[in-house]
């Protein structure tokens, strides 16, 4: 399954420069637990913004830069330059998961292809420059979990 995972505030804000506009430990733990030991796909700017150690994941970096050489962050990395063929083995596969982890351009390209979405909504409004507008109509809300500072909504694509 191809799943997009992200956090946003109540206005759809997902970033400020190349960082998160908030620092919520429980939400970061949710992201870590969900993606640990999994395959993740992200853009090069998102990869470069990660902490120095981002281990225990297979990271695929989507970039148009044919000369991109990712710095070592303690994880297996592979650079890819197109996503359509890459995501095929994951699509609709119940036991093989690929998590789409940003940034905004990668989400915009891949959310329509996703089997599922995992969306953390941070309570409150923050300042930043990266917003994500998502058409949720192809998806059905299947579960929602509330925490003190955010809630997590799980969506699955509606079979057509």
Curated annotation (Swiss-Prot):
Matches recorded under CDD domains: DHFR (cd00209)
Recorded GO MF terms: dihydrofolate reductase activity; NADP binding
InterPro entries tied to this protein: DHFR, DHFR-like_dom_sf, DHFR_CS, DHFR_dom
Pathway(s) where this gene product acts: Cofactor biosynthesis; tetrahydrofolate biosynthesis; 5,6,7,8-tetrahydrofolate from 7,8-dihydrofolate: step 1/1
Catalytic reaction(s) noted: (6S)-5,6,7,8-tetrahydrofolate + NADP(+) = 7,8-dihydrofolate + NADPH + H(+)
Keywords from the named record: NADP, One-carbon metabolism, Oxidoreductase
One GO BP annotation of this record: folic acid metabolic process
Binding sites annotated in the UniProt record for NADP(+): 6-7, 14-19, 43-46, 62-65, 101-106
GO CC annotation terms, alphabetical: cytosol
TM annotation in the entry: none
Oxidoreductase found in the keyword field: yes
Any single Pfam family the record assigns to this protein: DHFR_1
Binding-site list for substrate: 5-7, 27, 32, 57, 120
Chain ranges of the DHFR domain: 1-160
Gene3D superfamilies registered for this protein in UniProt: Dihydrofolate Reductase, subunit A
Assigned EC number: 1.5.1.3
Family to which the UniProt record says this protein belongs: Belongs to the dihydrofolate reductase family.
Role this protein plays: Key enzyme in folate metabolism. Catalyzes an essential reaction for de novo glycine and purine synthesis, and for DNA precursor synthesis.
Name by which UniProt lists this protein: Dihydrofolate reductase
Gene name of the record: folA
